[in-house]
Curated annotation (Swiss-Prot):
GO terms for cellular component: cytoplasm. One of its GO terms (biological process) is methionine biosynthetic process. This is Homoserine O-acetyltransferase. Belongs to the AB hydrolase superfamily. MetX family. Pathway: Amino-acid biosynthesis; L-methionine biosynthesis via de novo pathway; O-acetyl-L-homoserine from L-homoserine: step 1/1. It comes from Nocardia farcinica (strain IFM 10152). The keyword Transmembrane helix does not apply. The gene is metXA. Its EC number is 2.3.1.31. Transfers an acetyl group from acetyl-CoA to L-homoserine, forming acetyl-L-homoserine.
Length: 382
């Protein structure tokens, strides 16, 4: 994959966007003022696009990625992205998000490590931001995305779609800027972080920051990174993404092939989790993992808006809310609350899966149907 150089900082309009073939561009969006009052100067976002803009700029669909995702929604692995697209089959000609009709845009989130300004980026003093990068919230991530669309001249999105941390951003778009969203798809997330989620996620953060190579978060120029800690964090997280039934069906209490757990060898499930950890450590910045996990802990659409019920009740955006029946990280009742409180939601759509939280990624046929329904709403309300 080629990567466009950053457009001229003074550029505005559609010329800021990358080509419609999935090429990654690094787009300047200006200074971003955070909820905390802090300002991150000269923010850039990694952006990919599939499909052409309509003359009226009214066909844009924003796809929001989850914690360790990025803007690479579809496409093969390449020199920029070590993995294929995380929603392959969902975008393209004739796909649920049909690029013969829609212009699909995805950003790498503020604080990310795939083209967007984050802890590993260069600060104004020429050194990595590291521990100096400000704490951010999900709302701050949406503020950065809104700044991108302001610069392009897109004032209303035909749809915003996403799951997990991406679903948090969808909700913040709906609640914080309903006039800018014609339709939405919210998957595998709740209105606020729960104690269980915060407990699991702070444990992952502790694993990373306890690694001696964390170095207070200022490791980027040292040649050492806290990959041992992040590997442990990923193993913890992955257990919450899957289910007891699925894991036991695949691995039971079997030893890894050719190894004996009674003689220092590994269990099959242990080997699987180590593999997941190693894959992440090759492609993801631990400081971004900590920063974004902290942002998820802060997720609460009701903060400063009179509580969850009041915030959702005041949100008129037509939407589809979906949940996975086996999800133990974001249980189905958290999506039921959204469906009950959002005026624009007709009912909760339940995805049946053995895969738990990851079902919003793996159950492509079911998710494709929800995307088709969301695009129908977008067509009717844009």
């Amino acid at each position: 994959m080629s990567t466009d150089q950053s457009p001229c900082p003074s550029a505005t309009g559609a010329e800021l966007l990358p080509p419609p073939d999935g090429t990654l561009a690094i787009v300047p969006v200006g200074d971003i003022r955070l909820e905390s009052g802090a300002v991150i100067p000269d923010v850039h976002l990694g952006v990919q696009r599939w499909g052409e803009l309509s003359p009226g700029l009214d066909n844009v669909v924003l796809v929001e990625h989850a914690l360790t995702g990025d803007s690479h929604v579809v496409g093969p692995a390449d020199d920029v992205h070590q993995l294929p697209g995380w929603w392959n089959g969902m975008v393209g000609p004739g796909a649920p998000m049909d690029t013969d009709e829609w212009c699909v845009i995805a950003t790498n989130v503020l604080g990310g490590c795939k083209g967007s300004t984050g802890p590993g980026s260069t600060a104004p003093d020429g050194k990595p931001w590291g521990s100096r990068f400000p704490a951010i919230s999900i709302r701050d991530q949406v503020t950065a995305e809104a700044a991108l669309f302001d610069r392009i001249g897109i004032h209303r999105l035909a749809a915003v779609v996403g799951g997990s941390m991406g679903g948090m951003r969808v909700l913040e778009w709906m609640v914080g800027a309903p006039e800018r969203v014609a339709a939405a798809l919210v998957l595998a997330v709740g209105a606020r972080a729960t104690a269980d989620q915060i407990g699991t996620q702070t444990t992952q953060i502790a694993a990373i920051t306890a690694d001696p190579d964390w170095q207070g978060g200022d490791y980027h120029d040292t040649g050492r990174a806290p990959t041992t800690g992040m590997g442990i964090a990923r193993r913890i997280a992955h257990l919450t993404y899957r289910t007891e039934d699925e894991l036991d069906h695949r691995f039971a209490n079997h030893a890894q092939d050719g190894e004996d757990p009674f003689d220092g060898g590994r269990w099959a499930v242990q080997s699987y989790l180590e593999h997941q950890a190693e894959k992440l450590c090759r492609r993801f910045d631990p400081a971004t993992y900590v920063l974004l996990t902290e942002a998820m802990n802060r997720h609460d659409v009701g903060r400063g808006r009179g509580g969850v019920a009041a915030a959702l009740a005041a949100t008129p955006v037509p939407c589809v809310v979906g949940g996975v029946d086996s999800d133990r990280l974001y249980p189905l009742h958290t999506q039921q609350e959204l469906a009950d409180l959002l005026p624009g939601c007709a009912r909760l759509e339940v995805v049946h899966s053995r895969d738990g939280h990851d079902g919003f990624l793996t159950e492509t046929a079911a998710i494709g149907k929800l995307l088709v329904e969301t695009m129908r709403l977008a067509r009717a309300h844009r």
